């Protein structure tokens, strides 16, 4: 029986019940919660420090009206990082390799930023569709181009996250398969390939965190235009 490399991206099911809901809910169980003690343990302290640093960095370019998004964006960042990191473990399923899930995150949040801009400052929001100093003959063309680029934003968010994680998982599986095939025939080459696999895994750990950060950072930039 031939197994496709893309089988790892198929949503698992048990007795016909999709298990993607469990894969999405599992990270929330792993987060440590603060206790009533005066001094927290090291893990909670590091988690609190990371959240504070990230929130301050993310909210720095936003005005006071955008600070109410801090909790949502910080929670989304930690959630995406956890899902991406858990997906690097063997025999696990990564929900963020599904374009439908990523679009489910990207479209509502992008749409919320657009609605906020149209409600609070419609003139400024519509002004983004026409760059200042545009020649009069180019005005209709530029409005169409800017409108298309506006609606492409959520698609770019979802596709970027999906494509980067999918490509990384495929490369890891391809090189791991090569290691097992080369081990009995050419052990030296297999060891070198295993070293490449280890370095690629470290790179994928970085990509898993960076892509989650980029996803949330772009949302904050879209929010900055509309608050």
Swiss-Prot record:
Biological processes per GO annotation: proton motive force-driven ATP synthesis; proton transmembrane transport
Matching CDD domains: ATP-synt_Fo_a_6 (cd00310)
Domain of life: Eukaryota
Gene3D superfamilies given in the database record: ATP synthase, F0 complex, subunit A (1.20.120.220)
Keyword S-adenosyl-L-methionine: no
Keyword field: ATP synthesis, CF(0), Hydrogen ion transport, Ion transport, Membrane, Mitochondrion, Mitochondrion inner membrane, Transmembrane, Transmembrane helix, Transport
A GO MF term: proton-transporting ATP synthase activity, rotational mechanism
Entry-linked InterPro entries: ATP_synth_F0_asu (IPR000568), ATP_synth_F0_asu_AS (IPR023011), ATP_synth_F0_asu_bact/mt (IPR045083), F0_ATP_A_sf (IPR035908)
GO cellular component: mitochondrial inner membrane; proton-transporting ATP synthase complex
Catalytic activity: H(+)(in) = H(+)(out)
PROSITE patterns referenced in this protein's UniProt entry, alphabetically: ATPASE_A
Cellular compartments annotated: Mitochondrion inner membrane
Major site of localization recorded for this protein: mitochondrion
Matches recorded under SUPFAM superfamilies: F1F0 ATP synthase subunit A
Topological relation to the membrane, as annotated: Multi-pass membrane protein
Transmembrane segment boundaries: 9-29, 69-89, 98-118, 132-152, 165-185, 190-210
Function, as annotated: Subunit a, of the mitochondrial membrane ATP synthase complex (F(1)F(0) ATP synthase or Complex V) that produces ATP from ADP in the presence of a proton gradient across the membrane which is generated by electron transport complexes of the respiratory chain. ATP synthase complex consist of a soluble F(1) head domain - the catalytic core - and a membrane F(1) domain - the membrane proton channel. These two domains are linked by a central stalk rotating inside the F(1) region and a stationary peripheral stalk.
Assembly notes: Component of the ATP synthase complex composed at least of ATP5F1A/subunit alpha, ATP5F1B/subunit beta, ATP5MC1/subunit c (homooctomer), MT-ATP6/subunit a, MT-ATP8/subunit 8, ATP5ME/subunit e, ATP5MF/subunit f, ATP5MG/subunit g, ATP5MK/subunit k, ATP5MJ/subunit j, ATP5F1C/subunit gamma, ATP5F1D/subunit delta, ATP5F1E/subunit epsilon, ATP5PF/subunit F6, ATP5PB/subunit b, ATP5PD/subunit d, ATP5PO/subunit OSCP.
Stated family: Belongs to the ATPase A chain family.
NCBIfam families, A to Z: ATP_synt_6_or_A
Protein's recorded name: ATP synthase F(0) complex subunit a
Annotated source species: Carassius auratus
